């Protein structure tokens, strides 16, 4: 399986061919991304174009002899927006062709002449992983090989339908996302298309993998912080909506009599499908630009993943914000799709942080909210609607490890909650999770090696809540004003605390 049916693989999966599409305006194509073959015609060509249905992403692929193998059309708004942002981005300058030269014009003319003959790929279902056990290929000591097949996303060797790597250590031009795809390709726990494994049959056209592999894959793509990775993440998690599965031990027959009766029962891992996890792309926020302007130098540097921005020294002398600025701080905040980028968004684009220094937060507010900053930096947490450590978090707030919530409760007992944010710590709920070693499993049964999480009642938070209710004398706090939050763009607890104090 090429790990990811993305950008190009999505086209094959949906089965949309140029032959069945309205006429394309060939004189209005743009953002051409070509993959040449030395001394031969083009291998692949991707570009944006308009037809009667609107803007779409087109892809064509030729074999080594110049014969057209597949051409496809995809008009998903997320993909076309991502491709356009990638085309205009600084990191891909020189990769895209904006003014076609003679060779590219000939390729477009050839593609136009072959329009009616264009058909989808007549190969195995997208996402099929071919395995060969050791000894089958005559090479001892090799348990699995990834065979060159299909076609891949331009600039990568492992992302797409198949792979084009000469060996397992070779990577493409976009090495970061290519590495993510390669590692996800090697997930040891998966169910191939139309195959039966772990007690379930996969009726999809793509392979489904263990949730831990998908979680690592998503985190790897998000860590790259570039549009190439975002295109792949959006296609895999949002467009194709590929689910994942967790393994649970169940009692089943492990040895049968010849006449069909069960001779011996044992513990066998069974797969349980989990809902898909959405991918939050950095380019989805209009305030985030791939080509930062000189006036915003803070956006031109990669931001640290966990540590918030350092406050400039001159802010320490600023006074408390006025009533006008305090109102502005409670306005909706346009935040990127991840918590680690929300601090940058607040500093650069939020109106409450612009203008004179009198509207900025006093240093006391940051000290009072530092407990929530530690909570955001919790090493083990499960995001909303996310499956991690074989546990699905169905809530709309993150689920934290008990060590992190216990540290928060200890801080609040000693120092009290920040003024104006007395109930913020109750948003994650009164539960947390602990990690346990994987279930005992006989060697060779394909059991997951990652720890598994289980939810428990956070008694330290319950005691804190009871104490607050006793001091308050009422069961609710109607005076608490929550910060506005755009749906799908979560704000970190630290930034919520800053808005409330």
From Swiss-Prot:
Gene3D superfamilies per the UniProt record, alphabetical: Phospholipase A2 domain (1.20.90.10)
Chain positions recorded as Ca(2+) binding sites: 158, 160, 162, 185
GO molecular function: calcium-dependent phospholipase A2 activity; metal ion binding
Any Pfam family hit: Phospholip_A2_2
Modification after translation, per record: N-glycosylation does not affect the catalytic activity, but is required for proper secretion. A nonglycosylated form was observed in several cell types.
KW Cytoplasm (keyword) present: yes
Protein EC: 3.1.1.4
Single GO biological process annotation from the record: phosphatidylcholine metabolic process
Signal peptide per UniProt: 1-19
UniProt xrefs under InterPro entries: PLipase_A2_dom (IPR016090), PLipase_A2_dom_sf (IPR036444), PLipase_A2_His_AS (IPR033113)
Cysteine pairs bridged by disulfides in the record: 159-181, 180-220, 187-213, 211-244
Catalytic activity: a 1,2-diacyl-sn-glycero-3-phosphocholine + H2O = a 1-acyl-sn-glycero-3-phosphocholine + a fatty acid + H(+); 1-hexadecanoyl-2-(9Z,12Z-octadecadienoyl)-sn-glycero-3-phosphocholine + H2O = (9Z,12Z)-octadecadienoate + 1-hexadecanoyl-sn-glycero-3-phosphocholine + H(+); 1-hexadecanoyl-2-(5Z,8Z,11Z,14Z-eicosatetraenoyl)-sn-glycero-3-phosphocholine + H2O = 1-hexadecanoyl-sn-glycero-3-phosphocholine + (5Z,8Z,11Z,14Z)-eicosatetraenoate + H(+); 1-hexadecanoyl-2-(9Z,12Z-octadecadienoyl)-sn-glycero-3-phosphoethanolamine + H2O = 1-hexadecanoyl-sn-glycero-3-phosphoethanolamine + (9Z,12Z)-octadecadienoate + H(+)
Co-factor binding details: Binds 1 Ca(2+) ion.
Domain of life: Eukaryota
Main localization (coarse): secreted
Glycosylation sites: 167, 280, 325, 403
Extent of Polar residues compositional bias: 284-298
Subcellular locations according to the entry: Secreted; Cell membrane; Cytoplasm, Cytoskeleton, Microtubule organizing center, Centrosome, Centriole; Recycling endosome
Phospholipase A2-like, as annotated region: 150-291
Cofactor section: Ca(2+)
Sequence similarity: Belongs to the phospholipase A2 family.
Domain notes: The phospholipase A2-like domain represents the fully processed form after N- and C-termini are cleaved off. It is the secreted mature form found in biological fluids.
The protein's name: Group 3 secretory phospholipase A2
Species for this entry: Bos taurus (Bovine)
Gene of this entry: PLA2G3
């Amino acid at each position: 399986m090429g790990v990811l049916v993305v950008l190009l693989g999505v086209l094959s999966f949906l089965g949309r061919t140029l032959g069945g599409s309205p006429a394309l305006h060939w004189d209005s194509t743009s953002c051409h991304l070509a993959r040449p073959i030395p001394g031969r015609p083009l291998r692949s060509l991707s570009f944006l174009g308009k037809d009667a249905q609107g803007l779409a992403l087109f892809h064509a692929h030729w074999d080594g002899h110049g014969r057209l193998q597949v051409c496809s059309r995809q008009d998903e708004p997320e993909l076309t927006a991502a491709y356009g942002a990638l085309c205009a981005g600084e990191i891909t300058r020189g990769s895209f062709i904006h003014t076609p030269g003679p060779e590219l014009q000939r390729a477009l003319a050839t593609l136009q002449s072959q329009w009616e003959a264009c058909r989808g790929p007549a190969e195995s279902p997208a996402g099929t992983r071919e395995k060969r056990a050791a000894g089958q290929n005559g090479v001892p000591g090799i348990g699995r090989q990834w065979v060159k097949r299909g076609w891949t996303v331009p600039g990568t060797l492992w992302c797409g339908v198949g792979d084009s790597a000469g060996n397992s250590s070779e990577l493409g031009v976009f090495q970061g996302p290519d590495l993510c795809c390669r590692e996800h390709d090697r997930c040891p726990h998966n169910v191939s298309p139309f195959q039966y494994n772990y007690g379930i049959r996969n009726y999809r056209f793509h392979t489904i993998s263990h949730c831990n592999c998908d979680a690592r894959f998503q985190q790897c793509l998000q860590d790259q912080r570039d549009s190439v990775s975002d295109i792949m993440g959006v296609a895999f998690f949002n467009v194709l909506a590929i689910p994942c599965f967790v393994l649970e031990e169940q009692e089943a027959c492990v040895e049968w009599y010849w006449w069909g009766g069960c001779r011996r029962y044992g513990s066998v891992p069974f797969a349980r499908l989990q809902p898909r996890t959405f991918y939050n792309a950095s380019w989805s926020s209009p305030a985030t630009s791939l080509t930062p302007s000189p006036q915003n130098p803070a956006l031109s540097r990669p931001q640290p993943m966990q540590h918030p921005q350092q406050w400039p020294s001159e802010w320490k002398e600023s006074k408390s914000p006025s009533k006008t600025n305090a109102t502005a701080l409670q306005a909706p905040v346009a935040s990127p799709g991840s918590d680690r980028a929300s601090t940058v968004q607040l500093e650069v684009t939020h109106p409450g942080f612009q203008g004179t220094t009198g509207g900025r937060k006093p240093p006391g507010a940051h000290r009072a909210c530092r407990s929530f900053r530690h909570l955001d930096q919790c090493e083990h947490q499960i995001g909303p609607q996310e499956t991690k450590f074989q546990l699905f978090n169905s809530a709309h707030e993150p689920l934290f490890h008990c060590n992190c919530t216990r540290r928060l409760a200890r801080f609040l007992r000693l120092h009290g909650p920040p003024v104006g944010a007395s109930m913020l710590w109750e948003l994650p709920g009164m539960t947390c999770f602990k990690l346990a070693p994987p279930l005992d499993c006989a060697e060779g049964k394909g059991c997951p090696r990652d720890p598994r999480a289980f939810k428990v009642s956070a008694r330290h938070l319950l005691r804190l809540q009871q104490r607050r209710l006793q001091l308050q004398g009422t069961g609710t706090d109607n005076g608490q004003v929550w910060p506005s939050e755009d749906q799908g763009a979560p704000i970190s607890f630290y930034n919520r605390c800053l808005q409330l104090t």
